[in-house]
């Protein structure tokens, strides 16, 4: 009987907000907009690059050009790709927990709204990629979180039943995905969300992986 743990990436396994902030501020400054602090980025990071830039643009310019948004998003991704792990830190206890999972024959997977290539690049550069049996990004399927199929497709590919799986994430996007899929959900406290954790659906709440 296969068992699996499916993880979100940003804010769950890795504090990637500092590198995301640098990419965000690079494009915002280039196009004449205000920069943000890392705390602001933590509230936006779980939505993907396009939505992050979109939120910032809407704060400053209600009539911005859609083509500018597209170009800024592309430049954000290009900058981020080249600087993806300069400041990112693995969250406390993650490496030891993943080692425990592998030693107990638990299938480990990633379900992230990062593109698949960026997710794999980050995991490789922080030396975590070896632990994962499957990595699904925002562009792996035709849908992404909070669409439950992002998660259920992973489980089908891995041949794991829902009742034998757990999802671990840090935001309402992850929570909605797990709840819709009827998969038990562990919420990581202090993640990339604007909501108070007590208002986010979860079966269990943890502060880190120790």
Language model regions located:
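Metal-dependent phosphoesterase signature
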Residues: 31, 56-96
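Phosphate- and divalent-cation-binding pockets in alpha/beta enzyme and binding domains
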Residues: 23, 52, 93, 118-121, ...
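Active-site neighborhood of HAD-like aspartate-dependent phosphohydrolases
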Residues: 1-43
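An amphipathic alpha-helix signature
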Residues: 21, 25, 46-54, 73, ...
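Conserved SAM-binding loop
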Residues: 6, 13, 90, 108-111, ...
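Short, acidic loop-to-helix structural element flanking the phosphoryl-transfer center
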Residues: 81-110, 116, 120, 145-148
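Alpha-helical substrate-recognition element adjacent to the catalytic core
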Residues: 28-60, 66
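Asp-based, Mg2+/Mn2+-dependent phosphohydrolase catalytic module
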Residues: 1-3, 39, 99, 116, ...
